[in-house]
């Protein structure tokens, strides 16, 4: 019988491998394990330091402003508001070596950092940096001896920097006005009664008799109510480039409009009523009721010299009287706002920037200039106003004045307009209070350099030299899986 032979395979095809060959090859090739199973060595929540094995997200990144190792090599020309710090906390690395190291967060995850900051400042409330040590005034600079025609000029007056109470700043402002008069106006024929700008705290209308239209007690009530600005004709005060109006409690009703100036014309309806002349007054004879024309030193009160006010009013105009007793629709109350005095002169905010640590917000672009660093967090400048109630404030002021050897803040005690304003029973001071702020979770970069830039800028994006201590703690954690 003829034996049947298997048919030959088609041309171009190969037979399947034998069982022995398949089993033999599987022993020589390593088993492939997907990356998601490598959790024990390098998972989605792993943090890898250079030259170190992977770790889990149990680390913290500390941003320290005064590390001794960083000062000489990184921060010799910096300050506590703009500094570099090494975040690789290992004593084996110098700051220069740490700058070559990186902290790598697993690329398969989106990372966030819980950012907490500690900020301490030692900023005074009167300083050039905060535009709170100067203001502009328009004063009489000369008076012609022949024609008696006055000349007015603008002057920029500067206060000494320091941390003062509200009444101390008012005294310094008045002293600056008087010193300008002594240096300029007095030499050009200007009289003391023509000092046309005065900062006060009294309510000049107390004791006003609507029938006689005079202040019948014969003197203005020596009690503080609210800071005030008193102007003479032709004079003005400008707070456009000054924040002292916040200390006086005088603000614009529309704060975003450009410029802030108080002129004599703006204070319509705020004329200060004249005093009753007690030397000629007889209670039984009404014809003896006359306004006081001048003080004991012969300084005129300029009674009846403003045709818009009347014969029993001085030509001095008070912002406080114009605001409370003037026309609310067309007067100064329609343009300005009486607010609580802020002895900090208007505290501002500060911005935190961590350009090498946090991802840039979508509204910012990367920058190498501190004034343009992307902002990742913000908080108020840690400067607070403290108010105290002192029932003996005026007594303390008079006692201090009696014990002083000079009357530098009360040069004209005989004149009821120019005398030193009384101190308020509510005394305010500014105080630097350390702040601890939780800024929440911010998106982190997956590759973090070993040396970080940290910048704290003010509202004008300037580096603040008054920052005394700035610390930051960032705790990384996984937010979600990265999707593409």
From Swiss-Prot:
It comes from the Viruses. Residues 7-18 have a biased composition (Pro residues). Keywords: Capsid protein, Host nucleus, Host-virus interaction, Late protein, T=25 icosahedral capsid protein, Viral attachment to host cell, Viral penetration into host cytoplasm, Virion, Virus endocytosis by host, Virus entry into host cell. Signal peptide: none annotated. It holds the Pfam family Adeno_Penton_B. One of its GO terms (biological process) is virion attachment to host cell. GO terms for molecular function: structural molecule activity. It is found in: Virion; Host nucleus. InterPro entries: Adeno_Penton_B. Induction: Expressed in the late phase of the viral replicative cycle. Residues 1-24 are annotated as: Disordered. One of its GO terms (cellular component) is T=25 icosahedral viral capsid. Its main location: virion. All late proteins expressed from the major late promoter are produced by alternative splicing and alternative polyadenylation of the same gene giving rise to non-overlapping ORFs. A leader sequence is present in the N-terminus of all these mRNAs and is recognized by the viral shutoff protein to provide expression although conventional translation via ribosome scanning from the cap has been shut off in the host cell. Interacts with the fiber protein (via N-terminal tail region). Interacts with the capsid vertex protein; this interaction binds the penton base to neighboring peripentonal hexons. Belongs to the adenoviridae penton family. Major capsid protein that self-associates to form penton base pentamers, each in the shape of a pentagon, situated at the 12 vertices of the pseudo T=25 capsid. Involved in virus secondary attachment to host cell after initial attachment by the fiber protein, and in endocytosis of virions. As the virus enters the host cell, penton proteins are shed concomitant with virion acidification in the endosome. HAMAP family: ADV_CAPSP. This is Penton protein. It comes from Porcine adenovirus A serotype 3 (PAdV-3).
